[in-house]
């Protein structure tokens, strides 16, 4: 039942009925009898619990007159705000009143000031230097995701300059890797699709530095051009993924943890 509650938790907190159905379907597909499993969503739709009973043979207790009996197993999965993630992309977005399905600019082009902040750097267009400065490191991290953990409160250096060619190559690669049918959209997407970007939500932290306030997920849609036209846009998602959960700021990206 551990895997069943983890499967169901993917739909919390927004769709508790579907969470129960997903957990039941997963349990039944793995040999649990329907009449021997009970499921419950609780904690303001942020937790799901399963209890399953199974008939087992008692080998060593037979000398006491017990041949078989019911063994119960329970599991609980909890969802909460992500406070640390792996695989983030080197783009930073400042806090908005994020709305599901709305399009946001994750990197601007030269001459566009949607997210530029003079407190950070006049030459900053939204890119982050997660492993150090340089276009090659930036492109690798944008293409494949950062191979390390980021957490709320971390101070990050920004990657100055427009770096349009590395940005376009990386996003084009991610979009080409979406081989799902139908093509992933905000209403119907695979949770492992490369078009999904884990993006740090940031605030200024001094010259050429920013501080992580939380994390958000976006479905990347386009990187239309180069130079002044090289911007990255994505639609905001509310979803559950793997990662450390806690009491930090929530921006729609939640993690799941097995707590029992």
Positions of the model-derived regions?
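Acidic/negatively charged segments and metal-coordination signatures
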Residues: 1
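Glycine-centered secondary-structure boundary/capping sites
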Residues: 27, 31, 63-65, 101
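Signal peptide-directed extracytoplasmic domains
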Residues: 54-66, 70
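Short amphipathic secondary-structure patches
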Residues: 5-59, 81
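N-linked glycosylation sequons
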Residues: 17, 24, 40-47, 67-260
